[in-house]
């Protein structure tokens, strides 16, 4: 099949500046391009050529300004069997007009059918023009069908994944060496490390973890909170919230390290520094990919029961799920339990790694996506007979 991926106007592909969508595309494209002719559309970046082919995958990039129209014009020059539109239902009609014979697959990585984001008319039209819809979680699926019940028959839940080759677990020789190297880099030594990875925004909850640390250090002087991320992908500029975090952390500066933005290819190494990873999402997260990453690295995981986060974590088996998500004391209890019970923490971490190996390597994701594309293609062929 001739496949096209149309990224959003937010970030370039490959994921040189991060982004969950871009990282998933990077993960599945090597597998899909082995069997199919794959073209990826994304915004341009000064570090990338406007057109190039890398490992059988074709990339076409346009400036952010007028991006969607540039893509639509380019589609007219091709004959794609399936066009996969990422997270932009509003653009479906434009792309379908540009390539009317193509089957459209829409993937939803956020709650893009909110009333403030799309009208009833545009929402219905987008659903009617798509052959298949994928969602990153049951949570996002349920949010969509609550407003547009007619979409249900088209939806497949498509969980993301990781490149396991990038995540040597902490108990392997390679993982142990990386752990030691990065602990030396940040001057951590043998201290217990609580890790946060994500955008520095109130919705992600790093402030909750600083309040948690205040309580933890009363009983654990050898504990460090490592906060990895910037205010936006690859953006380390300060805003009011980041300034607030720094001020909040000032009394605990000996126990907190801000690494700022870390390139995506280095993130697996950051995970290996940790003794406990905490996904402190305060909003109804579609499903944070850091949950997959922590389990892949073999790090004991604590996550909040917000949005889709709990869907890929088995409570008390592959991670600990916190319901009282905005209460620092709930995090203290979970973190302290894992610190005090290393055998249990290790058992849980190994369960998590095994769970990822069995279900969420990017090869698994690519196979599930390919089935959606084939079903979309065959469904349209049958309709035309």
Task: Identify the residue ranges that each predicted region occupies.
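Conserved donor-binding/catalytic core segment of Leloir-type glycosyltransferases
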Residues: 4-6, 134, 177-179, 183, ...
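Short hydrophobic beta-strand element within catalytic cores of glycosyltransferases
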Residues: 300-303, 313
């Amino acid at each position: 099949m001739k496949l096209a991926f149309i990224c959003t106007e937010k970030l370039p592909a490959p994921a040189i500046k991060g982004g969950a969508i871009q990282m998933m595309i990077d993960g599945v494209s090597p597998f899909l391009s082995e069997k199919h002719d794959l073209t990826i559309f994304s915004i341009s970046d000064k570090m990338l050529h406007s057109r190039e082919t890398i490992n059988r995958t074709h990339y076409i990039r346009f400036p952010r300004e007028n991006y969607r129209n540039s893509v639509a014009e380019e589609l007219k020059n091709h004959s794609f069997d399936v066009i996969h539109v990422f997270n932009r239902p509003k653009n479906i009609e434009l792309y379908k007009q540009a390539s009317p014979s193509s089957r459209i697959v829409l993937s939803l990585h956020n709650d893009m059918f909110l009333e403030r984001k799309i009208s009833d008319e545009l929402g219905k039209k987008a659903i009617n023009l798509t052959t298949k819809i994928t969602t990153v979680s049951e949570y996002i699926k349920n949010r969509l069908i609550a407003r547009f019940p007619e979409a249900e028959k088209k939806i497949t839940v498509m969980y993301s994944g990781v490149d396991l080759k990038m995540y040597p677990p902490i108990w392997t020789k390679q993982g142990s060496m990386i752990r030691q190297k990065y602990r030396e880099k940040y001057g951590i030594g043998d201290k217990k490390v609580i890790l946060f990875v994500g955008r520095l925004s109130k919705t992600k909850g790093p402030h909750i973890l600083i309040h948690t640390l205040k309580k933890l250090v009363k009983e654990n002087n050898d504990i460090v909170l490592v906060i990895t991320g910037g205010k936006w992908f690859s953006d380390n500029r300060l805003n009011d919230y980041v300034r607030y975090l720094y001020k909040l952390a000032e009394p605990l500066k000996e126990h907190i390290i801000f690494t700022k933005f870390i390139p995506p290819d280095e993130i697996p190494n950051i995970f290996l520094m940790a003794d406990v990873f905490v996904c402190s999402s305060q909003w109804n997260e579609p499903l944070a990919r850091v949950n997959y990453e922590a389990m892949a690295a073999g790090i004991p995981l604590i996550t909040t029961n917000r949005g889709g986060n709990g869907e890929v974590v088995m409570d008390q088996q592959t991670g600990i799920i916190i319901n009282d998500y905005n209460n620092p004391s709930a995090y203290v209890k979970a973190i302290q339990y894992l610190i005090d019970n290393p055998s249990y923490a290790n058992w849980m971490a190994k369960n998590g790694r095994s769970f990822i190996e069995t279900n969420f390597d990017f090869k698994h994701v690519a196979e599930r996506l390919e089935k959606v594309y084939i079903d979309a293609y065959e469904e349209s062929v049958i309709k035309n007979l």
